[in-house]
Curated annotation (Swiss-Prot):
SUPFAM superfamilies: HesB-like domain. It is found in: Mitochondrion. The keyword Cell cycle does not apply. It comes from Bos taurus. InterPro entries: FeS_biogenesis, FeS_cluster_insertion, FeS_cluster_insertion_CS, HesB-like_dom_sf. This is Iron-sulfur cluster assembly 2 homolog, mitochondrial. The keyword Mitochondrion applies. One of its GO terms (molecular function) is iron ion binding. Involved in the maturation of mitochondrial 4Fe-4S proteins functioning late in the iron-sulfur cluster assembly pathway. May be involved in the binding of an intermediate of Fe/S cluster assembly. Disulfide bonds: none annotated. The gene is ISCA2. Residues 1-6 form a transit peptide.
Amino acid sequence: MAAVRGLTAVALRVVTPWQRSRLLAASRGPRALREVSFSSPEAGEGQIHLTDSCVQRLLEITEGSEFLRLEVEGGGCSGFQYKFSLDTVINPDDRVFEKGGARVVVDSDSLAFVKGAHVDFSQELIRSSFQVLNNPQAQQGCSCGSSFSVKL
């Protein structure tokens, strides 16, 4: 499928499940303090920031060439939703964000909706999951934190 830019294209894009993807939920261990530190971006381009708890959890669950893929797809109660999966294939339109040996990969269409945001791993009684925090491209989000509406 050719990469198509624009809000409508991303909203209507069909996202196929990644082969070998795993559910990224339950975890054990104490809740880590979330000290936000930044990955080094290329000048003039969008970036994703990885928190220390995100890096720590990725180092625990990834093997070999695996990385965390972040996608934005249409859906959820606010119009768009975040999708996390483990993957091993980097596509030509992907951007790789690395910190401390942990990698998060975002395709160029999704990056337009999350640039400047922080990827965190949160461990709570009701769930443990990767989350997007402080997304400057989001106008508002739902209470569960997995869907959002964009600023127009």
